[in-house]
A protein has these predicted regions:
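Bacterial N-terminal signal peptides
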Residues: 10-20
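An edge-strand/N-cap motif at the start of beta-rich repeat modules
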Residues: 22-57, 72
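Short loop/turn motifs that cap or connect beta-strands within the blades
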Residues: 26-36, 77-85, 127-132, 167-174, ...
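Repeated scaffold domains used in trafficking and secretory/extracellular systems
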Residues: 35-44, 85-97, 130-140, 174-184, ...
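Entry beta-strands of beta-propeller and related beta-repeat scaffolds
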Residues: 47-50, 100-103, 141-144, 187-191, ...
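Short glycine/acidic-enriched loop and turn motifs that connect beta-strands
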Residues: 55-60, 107-111, 149-152, 195-200, ...
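A short loop-to-beta-strand structural motif that recurs across blades of beta-propeller domains
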Residues: 63-67, 114-117, 152-156, 204-208, ...
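Blade-level signature of beta-propeller repeat domains, shared across WD40, Kelch, NHL, RCC1
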Residues: 336-377
Length: 377
């Protein structure tokens, strides 16, 4: 009888521990920063954040300002002009080229002029303005702009003093602003374009590379699933391209999955694959592509109805096979909207987006919970 009592006592203890573990919630308070819901934040390095405090989000309880936080302390703050709510024409955003070049972009909707100001040595520079189409890509050595003129598309490169370095004509298929583009060491440009015509049931993506004078070097056509979101892209230093986009089956709201396509610098398609998990929404949000075609992808896996909230990191080889996986739990006291972001040094963080105080959690701080069966096919 004593042995039986000890057995049941041990069983109850194990069950209570298991229940406590299953209901454990991650405390985000140590990771919260002073912010409002959907406040723009850029991660510069561990515990260093560039924050755009927007008075319109908090009823001007806190003034619109550019703030630099270092380990939770404000080391820089500059108030910005408030816009009248009945006639706004100025918008602010943040930009980061690398760990040393970052700052504020101010866009004037009435003149289509964008002003870029770097934050250097505790001072916001006077900056420079560029007029025209408002889609820019900040890179360590230059600022790129997608420019349309007289029915043609150009990628223009400016140095960080605002001086035009080059203007490269690109394909008639317009580069999508949200897919990204990059300038390689030989001044050629790699970029992603998509060509979607719903009436003709045509869904295509292109990985493109052009020389500095606009000569087409490679074009890789890729068929897409018929319901996709805006594709994003990662580029290797030698011009390889990895595009990724959320997708779903026609007519279904959930679950959605991620569609991946990778090509090399010579315009050869390495693979196209769909990353899925049964009854779970998967979204790739960040990727790093290397010269040999291997890649690291980060993303979220969630299903609110199942109270399943995870983030993941997958290592892929050049053929798109999963070499290793790292899945972390992100169960919190509320059903947050969250994403995975990288800083310029390559460190990964989980960032909440829909709470009054944004939390930025280093990926490595989250508990391992590998309970997802990934399918990459």
């Amino acid at each position: 009888m004593p042995n039986k009592r000890r057995f049941f006592a041990a069983l109850l203890t194990a069950l209570s521990l298991l229940s406590a573990w299953a209901l454990a919630e991650i405390d985000l308070k140590p990771y919260e920063i002073e912010s409002d819901r959907f406040t723009p934040v850029e991660i510069l390095a561990p515990d260093m954040y560039l924050v755009l405090q927007d008075g319109s989000l908090n009823g001007v309880k806190q003034p619109t300002a550019l703030v630099l936080l270092d380990h939770g302390q404000k080391v820089f703050e500059q108030r910005l002009p408030e816009e009248p709510s009945d006639d706004p024409h100025i918008s602010y955003s943040l930009f980061v080229a690398d760990e040393n070049r970052y700052g504020l972009r101010t866009f004037d909707n009435s003149t289509y002029a964008a002003c870029f100001q770097l934050l250097e040595n505790g001072t916001l520079t006077q900056g420079f303005s560029i007029e025209g189409y408002p889609h820019f890509e900040p890179l360590p050595n230059c600022l790129c702009r997608l420019h349309r003129q007289n029915g043609m598309c150009f990628v223009e490169r400016f140095d960080w003093d605002g001086i035009l370095l080059s203007s490269t004509p690109v394909s008639e298929i317009e580069p999508t602003p949200y897919s990204g583009f990059t300038v390689l060491d030989d001044k050629s440009i790699a970029y992603i374009a998509w060509d979607i015509n719903v009436s003709q049931d045509q869904y295509r993506l292109y990985h493109l590379r052009v020389s500095h004078d606009g000569k087409l070097l490679s074009s890789v056509p890729i068929s897409l699933p018929n319901e996709v979101f805006s594709p994003m892209g990662a580029f290797s230093p030698n011009g390889g391209i990895l595009s990724y986009t959320d997708a779903k089956l026609a007519g279904l709201r959930e679950p959605y999955f991620s569609f991946l396509a990778c090509s090399d610098t010579d315009g050869n398609l390495r693979f196209t694959k769909s990353l899925k998990a049964k009854n779970i929404n998967l979204s790739v949000t960040q990727a790093v592509l290397r010269n040999d075609g291997s890649a690291t992808i980060y993303g979220t896996a969630e299903r609110s109805s199942k109270k399943l909230f995870r983030v993941f990191k997958l290592e892929l080889d050049a053929s798109g096979q999963i070499l290793s996986r790292d899945v972390r739990d992100f169960t919190t006291r509320a059903d947050y909207q969250y994403t995975v972001k990288l800083d310029p040094l390559g460190n990964a963080y989980v960032v909440t987006e829909n709470e009054n105080r944004i939390a930025i959690v280093p990926f490595e701080d989250l508990p391992v919970l590998d309970d997802i069966e990934f399918m990459l096919e």
